């Protein structure tokens, strides 16, 4: 399954890991279809690490009003460049916030702790341009 993330820098095509993280993919797509992400900013950008978005109030403290369980046991649970992963404040506390990985070198410690649920397959250069 594929989707598109549209930013002010351009658009990216994402291939979702629906076998690894079916509930996370379903949650993300459901929020997107409801327009939840429309107009939201990437509120946390750390060069060489991640660009994080999905907070409705832009501070990193907001969410959809519920939490989903982590899904970290699949084959694609490695934070390499272009991976789309759930942000959370602890196990099973994610909801709407996600991040795009800039570089594998700085994100290995996130493997099997944050749910990887997709990867940018087109427009990968845009990940580095998000500010």
Q: Language-model segments: what does each one mean?
A:
Residues 1-131:
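Cyclophilin-like peptidyl-prolyl cis-trans isomerases
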């Amino acid at each position: 399954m594929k989707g598109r993330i549209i930013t002010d820098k351009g658009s990216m095509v994402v291939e979702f890991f629906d076998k690894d993280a079916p509930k996370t993919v379903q949650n993300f797509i459901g929020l997107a279809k409801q327009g939840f992400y429309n107009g939201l900013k990437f509120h946390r950008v750390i060069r060489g690490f991640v660009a994080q978005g999905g907070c409705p109030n832009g501070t990193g403290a907001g969410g959809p009003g519920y939490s989903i369980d982590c899904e970290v046991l699949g084959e694609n649970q490695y934070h390499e460049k272009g991976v789309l992963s759930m942000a959370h404040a602890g196990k099973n506390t994610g909801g709407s916030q996600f991040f795009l990985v800039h570089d594998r070198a700085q994100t290995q410690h996130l493997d099997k702790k944050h749910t990887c649920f997709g990867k940018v397959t087109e427009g990968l250069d845009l990940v580095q341009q998000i500010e």
